[in-house]
C-alpha cells in the first residue's frame, strides 16, 4: 500500500519528465525532427513553381538542412530527384539574375554529400557564375547594380561563396564582396539597420517617396529575412580568417539587434516591420528566416544567449502554431515585393516551408 501511495504521489513528476507539456514540447528534439519531416513531406506532395525557381531554391535550402538534421531518405531522394531528374543540374535561364542562381546552392550541398561526385553536377553552375562575374548586367530602371534588390542577398552571395569554397576559387569570393558592398551602400539604412527592398523604397526627398500609414519608412519583413538568412548561409561558408568576414559579422549583429526590437507579442513579425498595427497577423516566411538567423547566432556564440534566447523561443513556438495537422505551414505572404495583407492561415508557399525547416535545423542544436 505504501509503495502504491508513493507511486501515485510521484506519478505526475515522472510523467512531466517523460512527456513535454505545453509549449515545452516544441523544443523536444524528437518532436522537432518529426515536425520537420512532416512539413517537408507535405511540401514534397504539394509542389509549386518550376523546380529551378527561386521559390524552390529557398525551399530546398531548408530541405537540405532538414536532411542534415533527420537523415530522412525521403527528403534526400526528393532533393536528388529535383536536381538530377527534373533540373538535370541546370540553373534558370537568366544567367544575370540571382533568382536563377539560388537553386545551385542545393546542387553544391548534394555534390558535397555524395560519395560519387560527378563533374556534371556543377558544370552548369560554373558556366553560369563565370558569365555572371565577367559580363555586365543588363541595366534598366531600378536595376542599377547586379544585386539591386535585397532578396538577392539570400539568392546570390551564398551561391558565389559556396561555389568558390567548393572549387577553391577565390575570384568568386572577391566578386561576392564587390556586389554585396554595392547592394549595402544602395539599400541599407544605417539608422534603422534594415534594408529597403529596392530603390523604390529608398527615400530621395521627392514625390516618389513612399511611407507607411503611420508615417514610418517601409521595411519589408521577408525582404530583411532574406538578408539575415543569406548572411547566415554566407558566414557558414566564409573562413574565420577571411579578410572581409568582419564586415558581414558586423552587419549581421546590427540587424539582429534591430530585429528583436520589432518582434511582436505573439512571437512573429509583421509584414511591415515599422508599422505592425497596419498589418495585423504575423507573417511566417520573414519570421522563419529571423528565427533561423537568431538561433544560429546564439549557437555560434555570435549573439548573447541571455539577450536573444527569449525572442528565439517566442518565435519558434509561434511558428509551430502555424503548422496544421497535415504539415502545411500557413500565414505565409504570397510572392511580392513589399508588405501586404493578402494572406491567412490557409496561405502557404514553398519558401515558407524552407524558412521553417532552416529555423528548426538550428533550434534543435541549441538549448532554447
Features from the language model and the residues they span:
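C-terminal motif of bacterial Sec signal peptides marking the signal peptidase cleavage site
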Residues: 13-16
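CBM-like carbohydrate-recognition segments
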Residues: 24-57, 64-104, 110-128, 269, ...
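Inter-helical turn/loop segments and adjacent helix faces that build the functional surface
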Residues: 163-174, 234-246, 297-305
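Alpha-helical scaffold segments in carbohydrate-active enzymes
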Residues: 38, 42, 65, 85, ...
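Sec-dependent signal peptide recognition
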Residues: 2-9
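Bacterial lipoprotein signal-peptidase II cleavage site
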Residues: 18-22
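Extended ligand-binding groove/face enriched in aromatic
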Residues: 76-77, 88-209, 214-216, 326
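Oxyanion-binding "anion nests"
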Residues: 226-274
Amino acid at each position: 500500500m505504501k509503495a502504491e501511495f508513493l507511486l501515485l504521489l510521484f506519478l505526475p513528476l515522472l510523467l512531466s519528465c517523460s512527456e513535454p507539456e505545453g509549449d515545452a514540447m516544441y523544443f523536444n528534439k524528437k518532436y522537432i525532427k518529426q515536425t520537420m519531416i512532416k512539413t517537408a513531406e507535405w511540401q514534397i506532395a504539394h509542389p509549386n513553381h518550376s523546380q529551378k525557381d527561386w521559390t524552390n531554391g529557398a525551399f530546398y535550402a531548408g530541405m537540405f538542412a532538414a536532411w542534415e538534421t533527420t537523415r530522412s531518405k525521403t527528403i534526400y531522394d526528393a532533393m536528388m530527384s529535383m536536381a538530377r531528374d527534373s533540373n538535370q543540374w541546370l540553373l534558370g535561364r537568366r544567367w544575370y539574375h540571382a533568382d536563377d542562381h539560388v537553386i545551385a546552392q542545393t546542387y553544391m550541398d548534394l555534390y558535397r554529400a555524395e560519395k560519387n561526385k560527378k563533374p556534371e553536377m556543377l558544370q552548369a553552375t560554373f558556366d553560369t557564375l563565370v558569365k555572371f562575374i565577367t559580363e555586365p548586367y543588363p541595366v534598366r530602371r531600378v536595376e542599377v547594380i547586379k544585386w539591386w534588390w535585397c532578396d538577392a542577398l539570400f539568392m546570390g552571395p551564398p551561391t558565389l561563396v559556396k561555389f568558390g569554397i567548393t572549387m577553391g576559387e577565390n575570384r568568386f569570393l572577391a566578386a561576392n564582396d564587390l556586389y554585396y558592398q554595392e547592394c549595402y551602400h544602395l539599400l541599407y539604412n544605417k539608422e534603422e539597420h534594415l534594408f529597403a527592398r529596392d530603390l523604390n523604397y529608398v527615400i530621395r526627398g521627392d514625390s516618389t517617396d513612399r511611407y507607411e500609414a503611420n508615417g514610418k519608412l517601409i521595411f519589408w519583413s521577408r525582404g530583411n529575412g532574406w538578408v539575415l538568412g543569406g548572411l547566415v548561409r554566407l558566414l557558414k561558408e566564409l573562413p574565420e580568417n577571411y579578410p572581409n568576414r568582419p564586415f558581414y559579422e558586423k552587419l549581421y549583429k546590427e540587424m539582429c539587434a534591430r530585429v528583436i526590437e520589432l518582434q511582436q507579442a505573439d512571437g512573429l513579425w509583421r509584414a511591415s516591420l515599422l508599422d505592425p498595427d497596419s498589418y495585423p497577423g504575423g507573417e511566417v516566411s520573414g519570421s522563419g528566416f529571423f528565427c533561423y538567423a537568431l538561433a544560429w547566432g546564439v549557437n555560434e556564440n555570435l549573439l548573447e544567449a541571455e539577450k536573444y534566447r527569449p525572442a528565439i523561443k517566442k518565435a519558434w513556438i509561434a511558428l509551430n502554431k502555424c503548422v496544421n495537422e497535415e504539415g502545411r505551414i500557413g500565414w505565409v505572404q504570397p510572392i511580392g515585393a513589399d508588405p501586404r495583407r493578402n494572406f491567412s492561415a490557409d496561405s502557404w508557399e514553398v519558401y515558407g516551408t524552407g524558412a521553417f525547416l532552416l529555423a528548426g535545423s538550428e533550434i534543435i542544436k541549441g538549448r532554447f
